[in-house]
Amino acid sequence: MKLTFNKNLYAFLLMLSVVFTAFAQEKVKPIIKDGEAQIVEAFNNPDEWIRHDLWVETSFDTDGDGKLDRMHVAVTRPKQTETEGLKLPVVYESSPYYAGTAGFSEGTFWNVKQELGETPKPRIHPEVTRTGKRPIISNSQIKTWVPRGYIVVHSSSPGTGLSQGSPTVGGDNESLAPKAVVEWLCGRAKGYTTPYGNETVKAYWSTGKVGMTGTSYNGTIPLAAATTGVEGLEAIIPIAPNTSYYHYYRSNGLVRSPGGYLGEDIDVLYDFIHSGGEEPLTPMKNTKVNDANLPNQLFKSKREYSNAMVRDTEMKNGMDRETGDYNDFWAGRDYLNDMAPMKAALLMSHGFNDWNVMPEHSYRIYKRAKEMGLPTQIFYHQNGHGGPPPITMMNRWFTRYLHGVNNGVENDARAWIVREDDPRDKPTAYEDYPNPNASNVSLYLSPGAPKKGGLSTKKITTNKSETLVDNYSFTGSGLAQADITNHRLLYVTPKLTKDVHISGVPKITVTLSSNKPAANLSIWLVSLPWQEGRRAKITDNIINRGWADPQNHKSIRESEPLEKGKFYTITFDLNPDDQVIKKGQQIGLMIFSSDKEFTLQPEPGTELTIKLDETSLTLPIVGGASALTSAFKN
């Protein structure tokens, strides 16, 4: 049988072959729509993700073995980064928590029942049992970002998990460790397949554009990395970050616990996270430490060495739990002091009712970043600790600065605040925070103890003083609700006839004397009447809080004993806030001494006498004095 050649059919089949080949060779890439990275189905199958781990070499040695510490890093990436040579930007999260933490057994925290200024009694030191299996460090972030065309990277911070080194809780190595990981992602640092070997591994799948995010300690680390100015870290989204360990464990010279963790201090957190360093410190003959502050001894493990060097020497000598004063130890753990090199675009998130990592932590960094001219946005919600911005905000931020898409995010509103009755994913846009229409209004006190005194915009000379008696056994909420008590002073505004919008940082000035050389000073702003029961919301009752040590009336670096009968004036900020106080409520200023939820608890009986004429409250009110006085009128 003779076959006849058909040129038309051949041409058609050839064209079809070219089309199929071109289609087969078309590579998957991220999809951007409306300024946001979209979920790409080809990236959305977890079974096809490539997961592997490695160790990145840092520039420091903090575990005493004489070798540069290596950080344990895990990578999750779409298969196309291997099969098609696709390069993608990176979303990176680092944490000290991934490999387990110590428990809260009795004696782990400092005993807060002590006299002020006394040396505290010793506490116990729990050990962490490391958890986790290679190659996975964490599964956080991956379901959000890998399908949208990102690679997700995790690392354990120094001295935790399989990362070498020592935890320092805000020390330099906790900034330099994520810096090294970013540099590896950008091709400038060495990565290894094992913690001690020489076989290298490269991040050939990375575009060299890195963003970082995380919550709480995991949110602190992005800021720490950004303060190094490392090239390639383009954007960070810290969520409820601790930006100063002094501000976390102290207030204006006062020893003050973070909310929910009474008796915690920086060394407690060190023990809580120290899951690494179980391996022997070898060779043993080289582990003898000659340090004036340490016994001349051999250490059995890296963990033992780190405990001696960091917890039992640096922290013990620097944290100063006796006075609560600010010093160089704390200054070295305050990221505000390190921001000069920072270049990363900053989107911050925090809750106004976060009494663990308080809202001042984000505001102080946001404010400085604005002054530096960095791209900045801030998202505040009305809840407690944690809580990211809406995914749309995060997506637009990373799309702009990691994918490099000009989506106009830098022209969006600078501040986004969730109003009291709105869901968290429906924030209200504002030109900035604090509200540009807010101005400071001073309020003054009139007598009323042991009941309630007055709080108004009119200053009336009374030449009167009122006295409270410290007793830590009473809670702040109980004192605020009491009709009569000599354990607090409470001054209230008239009942509001209109809503009052507070936006900014309230300030308090108190002139006081004490019958003892040391005293706690606690300030609450409250909304009255107090709401109880299931219907009470987190935005009810407590408007703001603040604490101070009257011994530090001159400076948070210097304290002096109080002379009996002598009056001292101390001025300090409360926390940033943006809250609408509803009409029908009264704003109350409560002054008391020991705060059962936050401060040390000395024996009851200390008397604080307040000069009313020389004590005042400053509130940032949207609409200023006219708005507030109008709300006071019947």
Each predicted region: which residue ranges?
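Catalytic-loop region of hydrolases
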Residues: 25-115, 130, 139-141, 151, ...
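Catalytic histidine neighborhood in serine/cysteine hydrolases
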Residues: 370-386
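Conserved alpha/beta-hydrolase
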Residues: 146-162
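Catalytic nucleophile-loop/oxyanion-hole region of alpha/beta-hydrolase
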Residues: 132-135, 161-178, 189-192, 384-390
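Accessory cap/linker subdomain of secreted extracellular hydrolases
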Residues: 28, 40-43, 59-61, 68, ...
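C-terminal, loop-rich substrate-recognition/catalytic regions characterized by aromatic stacking residues
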Residues: 28, 35-37, 379, 388-634
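Short beta-strand/loop motif that positions the catalytic acidic residue
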Residues: 342, 348-350, 354
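Conserved alpha/beta-hydrolase "acid-adjacent" motif
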Residues: 355-361
